[in-house]
Amino acid sequence: MAEDQRKVWLIAEFLEDSFVGCSVFYDYEDRERVARSYRIVDYNTGKLLHHVFVSRAFLDDHAEAEIVPALQDLALVGCLRIAGTRRVTVKSQMIEIEVGA
């Protein structure tokens, strides 16, 4: 579990570094399907900019040292910018953007 916590922190740090001027909040979601939920909020306005779900499979399939490179390879930051406030789910080898909203 300690390794999982480190992975969760690495993802939060990656998002904070990628979205300067924003706060990143994370918490548990459905343990069966989604491991963590991250909300990226504009620090000045409090407006929700992005909502990311990171699957249990992603955390399980990537070693700690692979987390950030895998997010970069999946182009997570670009996907978030395209998605806006729509939900983005990071799966083991792909990213899904919620349709609509």
PLM-predicted stretches and their roles:
Residues T89-I95:
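C-terminal interaction segments
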Residues E13-F53:
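Amphipathic, interaction-prone secondary-structure segments
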Residues M1-Y28, D60-V77, R81-T85, E96-A101:
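Negatively charged, low-complexity tracts enriched in Asp/Glu with abundant Ser/Thr
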Residues Y43-P69:
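Acidic, low-complexity, intrinsically disordered interaction modules
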Residues R31, V88-T89:
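Unusually extended, aromatic-enriched hydrophobic runs near protein termini
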